[in-house]
């Protein structure tokens, strides 16, 4: 009788699992792989390597930089890239985007980092395991932008629409503007 009760309970659990309402986190397409995209918990500005930075000029150049982009990677990612010329599977790149502040100083017109506007995160998927499982993954990377100080909830909805246009000119370098990252030179 006890065995029969256990079998009945197991069957009930299996049926209940199938009837679970759609839209739960685990049933959303790509939710499990999208969880791999987030701003790292590590203090990456202190513990990771600063790859380099870019200044994005304002529409009127004399107004200086409208944004400063500062990019970081783990030391093991830098070592692997310098040894092989490719980003290893699982590599994480974090790009801080700061609003540019520009003013006159004794050295001339200077731009420097103002408030944090957000962060881009890219996670390398060399084997393409996540391609097609989520619109945030493709072309060998996971792609996400986090506004302000947000670290988990991305505003990116589809890397093809939200990210690829800016990265396409760097396709020959795995969609990364490596020319701005002198530490990667071998």
Residue ranges of predicted features:
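Sec/Tat signal peptide C-region and signal peptidase I cleavage site
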Residues: 12-15, 20
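Catalytic cores of secreted/periplasmic or lumenal enzymes
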Residues: 25-29
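Secreted/periplasmic proteins
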Residues: 49-71
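N-terminal post-signal-peptidase region of extra-cytosolic proteins
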Residues: 67-83, 104-107
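Sequence context surrounding c-type heme c attachment/ligation sites in exported
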Residues: 19, 23-24, 34, 41-47, ...
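Bacterial N-terminal signal peptides
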Residues: 2-11
């Amino acid at each position: 009788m006890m065995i029969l009760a256990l079998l009945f309970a197991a069957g009930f659990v299996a049926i209940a699992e199938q009837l679970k309402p759609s839209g739960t986190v685990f049933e959303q397409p790509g939710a499990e792989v999208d969880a791999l995209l987030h701003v790292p918990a590590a203090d990456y500005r202190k513990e990771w390597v600063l790859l380099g930075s870019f200044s994005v000029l304002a529409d009127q150049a004399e107004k200086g930089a409208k944004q400063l982009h500062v990019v970081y990677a783990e030391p093991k990612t830098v070592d692997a890239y310098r040894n092989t010329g490719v980003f290893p599977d699982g590599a994480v790149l974090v790009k801080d985007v700061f609003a540019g502040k520009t003013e006159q100083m004794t050295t001339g017109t200077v731009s420097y980092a103002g408030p944090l506007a957000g962060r881009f995160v890219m996670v390398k998927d060399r084997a393409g395991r996540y391609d097609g499982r989520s619109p945030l993954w493709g072309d060998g990377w996971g792609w996400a932008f986090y506004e302000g100080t947000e670290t988990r909830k991305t505003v990116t909805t589809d890397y093809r629409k939200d990210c690829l246009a800016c990265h396409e000119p760097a396709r020959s370098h795995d969609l990364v503007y490596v020319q701005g990252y002198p530490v990667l030179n071998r």
